[in-house]
Regions:
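Short amphipathic alpha-helix
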Residues: 16-26
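Donor-nucleotide binding loops and adjacent catalytic segments primarily
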Residues: 23, 183, 189-263
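Conserved nucleotide-sugar phosphate-binding/catalytic loop shared by glycosyltransferases and other
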Residues: 32-87
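Conserved nucleotide-sugar donor-binding subdomain of glycosyltransferases
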Residues: 72-107, 115
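Conserved nucleotide-sugar donor-interacting segment of glycosyltransferase catalytic cores
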Residues: 95-153
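A donor-sugar binding/catalytic signature common to diverse glycosyltransferases
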Residues: 107-111, 253-296
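A nucleotide-sugar donor-handling region in carbohydrate enzymes
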Residues: 138-216
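C-terminal amphipathic helix plus adjacent low-complexity
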Residues: 321-352
């Protein structure tokens, strides 16, 4: 049976959101496919999103960027981390190639760590990158166009393909770029069930608050009450607010809660934006102007969904009631149909 080894970046949950639907489609097409997932993402989150059976291995195929919050990049710390990661690059790649040979991998799919690609290329194993961004462009934006940036780009450029999920960064300098349609696992709208369980009066709004898997939270306990609005928050935030509802108490998958919400408050991120457009959920997002992926994501959501930008200060103070009312008064576009997972699964099946 073929063995697919999948590397998923731990820099936020968007990488899991892009990869999970593809692995589920592959399992449907090839039930005997052996899957190994290497990631720093907690196994509990991986299992909540990936429904195909897989073996978990902890692993770091990239270091992303050092962050002080969900919005703020630590440039100096990131530069130092990359220098350390690349200090003995040849030995690191050799170790990676040895591990992949020991796993008897038939194909390597990486979202979007470049070390697994380099290891696969040295071991002669077919490999592809998948993502809406790449770390060469992100690193270059913050740390400059130097030898490290060139080495990262080289790993991506030598893959059999870079499957660029839409919406995504342009990546014009990659000769192996293969654009694919949006990727999302769309939940089921179970709002009537939620209304009964929570005993919500008619017209009550549920607003989901998400940081996309990056540490940090908004000070919801400081937000003023908005008549007819309830906040869906995660348990780890320990929010004390009369209108807060803890997600985990609802015993419903995150995707179903997402699809059952009246709005999403988030930072610009692939999983959040695409799942919102596919679920027909309006979005309030806080500006993340320096993140290079943001312009492509925002332009796409403005075209295919409903969204409004709110300032960081407005979110810290809870001063956005008028923006919510505005977005709820607008006509809702037709939900996006995400075809990217099928496209990528078909592409991989042809090569297994």
């Amino acid at each position: 049976m073929p063995h697919l080894v999948v590397s998923i970046s731990g820099h936020g949950f968007g990488h899991v959101a892009q990869t999970a639907p593809i692995l589920d489609r592959l399992h449907e097409r090839i039930p005997q496919l052996r899957l190994t997932v290497r990631s720093a993402v907690p196994p509990s989150h991986l299992h909540s999103r990936i429904h195909a059976p897989f073996t978990y291995l902890p692993g770091e195929g990239d270091i992303g960027m050092e962050m002080s919050s969900a919005l703020d990049v630590c440039v100096d710390e990131s530069r130092a981390a990359y220098r350390a990661f690349h200090a003995d690059w040849d030995a690191r790649v050799a170790d990676e190639a040895r591990l992949l040979r020991e796993l008897k991998a038939d194909f390597i799919l990486s979202n979007v760590g470049y070390l697994p690609l380099a290891g696969a290329q040295r071991a002669g194993i077919p490999n592809a990158a998948l993502c809406s961004l790449n770390w060469a462009d992100i690193y270059r934006h913050y740390c400059g166009d130097n030898e490290i940036a060139a080495r990262i780009r080289d790993c991506y450029a030598k893959a059999d393909a870079f499957l660029r999920a839409s919406p995504g960064m342009a990546m014009h300098d990659l000769p192996n770029l293969v654009p694919v349609a949006p990727i999302a696992a769309v939940g089921t709208n179970r709002r009537e069930e939620l209304n009964r369980r929570l005993e919500l009066p008619p017209g009550e709004k549920l607003v989901l608050i998400s940081m996309g898997g990056i540490a940090g939270r908004w000070p919801v306990e400081r937000w003023p009450r908005i008549a007819g609005v309830r906040w869906l928050v995660q348990q780890s935030w320990q929010v004390s607010h009369p209108d807060a509802i803890v997600l985990e108490t609802l015993q419903m998958s995150f995707g179903d809660l997402f699809a059952s919400s009246d709005a999403l408050i988030c930072k610009p991120g692939y999983g959040s934006f695409v799942e919102a457009a596919c679920s027909g959920v309006p979005v309030l997002y806080v500006s993340r102007a320096d993140w290079p992926e943001s312009p492509a994501l925002i332009a796409w959501l403005e075209q295919h969904g409903l969204c409004r930008e709110v300032s960081r200060n407005a979110l810290e103070q809870g001063n956005f009631a008028e923006t919510l009312e505005e977005i709820w008064s607008m006509p809702q576009p037709e939900p996006v149909i995400p075809e990217g997972a099928n496209q990528v699964a078909d592409w991989i099946v042809m090569r297994l």
